[in-house]
């Protein structure tokens, strides 16, 4: 966003502000009185002239807040009013305070009963003369009613209707239960019985008794207790409770706020929640990841910096650690209270707009796990729209790039520094009036109904944009795409601007703007971003088509590739009207969806691989492609909040997420922050840098690596940035495959640990590590000065992505992460499709080509039988790679699908005795260079522990067998060392080095090792003992098991292996090789191996 919010202690309508600005004080008069019952319906800021509360409930004390002006003695304010049509005694307003040119008053009308109708008028005068009046205003008092019992049920074969009895009043509520899937229950409650109830599947059976009714599908059993009423949901066994409503004898469950007859203002439900339950999701949230103990608002809001519990993306969908989710099917404001009213209860309440036909409508979503719950939610609200491959490279953006020369310079800088970008985003490209015409373009204005073609414009050589089409061509010729900024407003300005004025006149005449509820156009309130501007009604098809026609030339003539759709949090007030028949209070959350959807669909109608990049939305937003986390400062705290936002967004079904890495605004990031942010952003769904301009100060604020290097003085920033962006391009085949899985299933790419491992309670509070796709665990360093990172590894075996060190899971480890290091772990059993450069280097220069591979590679970490579905967009289909590990037979088999190009397997095993493809023995090469020059063959890398198997193009599947292999050794240099050091000064070691100085009493190296099953294993110790025969004590799980003889080796450059049998327990074991009282001689220590017998 490039135009900042205006703030103030309170806000008035623009006309009211103008009356203050133009006021010339009268000495003996009152010039005005003002009261606005709802203000602008801002959830977070109550204006000084509102009614309190805005919507009174029985028992509330009602205050009428008033202002008069100017400030003069002798003024009086009061309220005249009626109750249920009967005149009441006038209520004088008490003076509260003076501020600026205004006096503020407050009148106490008292409390009321449900059903009371109050009409009031506000008055003010001075010394009993010159009276000013505003009003009348009306409100109807409501009160809570709830379901008490069920009188009867009706099975309609595709839905069951429960006829309910309320605890009070004369309404005849109906509860409609239906199933949209075997594990998804939809609950609709019509308090008046007049709402439109939906049908579902005929996939259930009903069992009814006088006291209970059971609804049964293959995956759920739903119990209805009739008196008192309560819903409970069980697993298919009918005894394992998943969730239940709160006992209505203690606290109401299903309830509604009503006047008793024709108004339903709010609807809600309450569920029992044991203290062990956690709550996640609710949209994009920046503060607490675990929401228990919090109230969460579903309210789209533009908070510039320091978002905390406010959000651009509010989604009424939550995940519960007990294995289910609840989606409240409403775009009105709603609130979730999560163990705040009662410590063993959560509830959700939704506004309704007041109609008698209003309903509570929510889905109870179950699944095999929480990922399945998110997938089921996507089935209801829409699957994520698939992204083109270019969306997953680096996006470059800066508000300093306000002219063509700067864009070309940025492209040149990226290329010259080997930084592979795939997108350029421009915010400061357009004039400040139409927002669709390039700055400094000259043209003849058209009527508001007409659209410009690119040829209508002339671009002066002295202007900022001398040839936009040539610029777009340059972007494309460098393998990148061009995205332009947009906002959904028709801007108001105090000075004329012909084209804008023509557009506004036509927009107004055609009723294309959002209405104000009084026959005119809604204008954004004073004090808000783009105040007094019109807002396009994107629910109006004609309006949408007209709006987009103005922007057609950007595709047709310039050749852009998408839009950055900023803003959208611009609907203030409940009375605004839309073409779809909805009003402002129902459209505030929904408006960004309509806006972004319009741009997204239009862009993709112009180019199949176009995208939209947006900030705000609500349920279903995932169908509108990419979202970023809004405007944040360049601090470690904001970094942490951004990652939290990404995790909560992903828990809410939004898979394609990004942030302005290292922050958008504020103090320029330090080198440390910039590097740490780079590391994390390289493993985010979408990677981008962007920044706010510092205006005319002359200080360049762009967050590009070349500017960051210049600003911080750290001359390693560019190379560091290049390493991580190239690593991202190495992983692009994996990232793009995971993205396809996200669009197919709704399961996000960036997964909170609690989403991936919901049964492991250790994961619930982890917000500084996450899964990137199904195979990679990312643990960014997010605290200033931190170099030892605590990382929780869930059960299973994990491998350090960079170094190959093995780490058994089910525990927290400490990882040394220097400022240039990002901890990344791979699960055993993973298969990673990659694109590596000519030297097979991860992080080496690879370029930004999306249509070819330099070295297509598949990294395989064997464990049992695993498969991976690789999205081969170049080859045109999804292909499945299968790994079958049989270490008991000393064999690993990889089934490679038909791929019409050369590819290389990188299999994480010990060195094979031989490798075959299709039964034929392959040629072994002694160096990677030799293999690179060959068409096929294999090579073993003793450092990385990968067997490289190079395969040619094949029109059929290929079976590759590695013979004589076992699980990779545990390297001594990665063990827990005491009294020893590491070295590389002798040849023949494996891994990255060996343990040296292993020569005095107490020296030891400990390993955490993992085995699939308890039993006897062969343990091998690889060592060098050039000075004579040595020995070491071996401890397993703190028990000494043997003194291992280590016969002399020929020299310190030769290595021996000592072997013995050892009993190991299932899972994690600790093995320590120690110099104790029975040990002798100094040795060099390379590794240990655990071999199945």
From Swiss-Prot:
Residues 1-29 form the signal peptide. The keyword Hydrolase does not apply. Keywords: Carbohydrate metabolism, Glycosyltransferase, Secreted, Signal, Transferase. It catalyses: 2 alpha-isomaltosyl-(1->4)-D-maltotriose = alpha-isomaltosyl-(1->3)-alpha-isomaltosyl-(1->4)-D-maltotriose + D-maltotriose; alpha-isomaltosyl-(1->3)-alpha-isomaltosyl-(1->4)-D-maltotriose = cyclobis-(1->3)-alpha-D-isomaltosyl + D-maltotriose. GO terms for biological process: carbohydrate metabolic process. One of its GO terms (molecular function) is hydrolase activity, hydrolyzing O-glycosyl compounds. Residues 968-1091 form the CBM6 domain. Induction: Part of the ctsUVWXYZ gene cluster, which contains genes for synthesis and transport of CTS. CDD domains: CBM35_Lmo2446-like, GH31_N, GH31_transferase_CtsY. InterPro entries: CBM6, Cellulose-bd_IV, Gal_mutarotase_sf_dom, Galactose-bd-like_sf, Glyco_hydro_31_C, Glyco_hydro_31_N_dom, Glyco_hydro_31_TIM, Glyco_hydro_b. Optimum temperature is 50 degrees Celsius. Its main location: secreted. Its EC number is 2.4.1.387. Optimum pH is 6.0. Stable in the pH range 4.5 to 9.0. The active site is at 566 (nucleophile), 569, 631 (proton donor). Gene3D superfamilies: Galactose-binding domain-like (2.60.120.260), Glycosidases (3.20.20.80), glycosyl hydrolase (family 31) (2.60.40.1760), Golgi alpha-mannosidase II (2.60.40.1180), Immunoglobulins (2.60.40.10). Glycosyltransferase involved, together with CtsZ, in the conversion of alpha-1,4-glucan into a cyclic tetrasaccharide (CTS) constructed from four alpha-glucopyranosyl residues. Catalyzes the alpha-(1->3) transfer of the isomaltosyl moiety of alpha-isomaltosyl-(1->4)-D-maltotriose to another alpha-isomaltosyl-(1->4)-D-maltotriose, resulting in alpha-isomaltosyl-(1->3)-alpha-isomaltosyl-alpha-(1->4)-maltotriose formation. In addition, the enzyme catalyzes the intramolecular cyclization of the product, generating the cyclic tetrasaccharide cyclobis-(1->6)-alpha-nigerosyl. Belongs to the glycosyl hydrolase 31 family. PANTHER family: HYDROLASE, PUTATIVE (AFU_ORTHOLOGUE AFUA_1G03140)-RELATED (PTHR43863), MALTASE-GLUCOAMYLASE (PTHR43863:SF2). This is Isomaltosyltransferase. It comes from Sporosarcina globispora (Bacillus globisporus). The lineage of its organism: Bacteria, Bacillati, Bacillota, Bacilli, Bacillales.
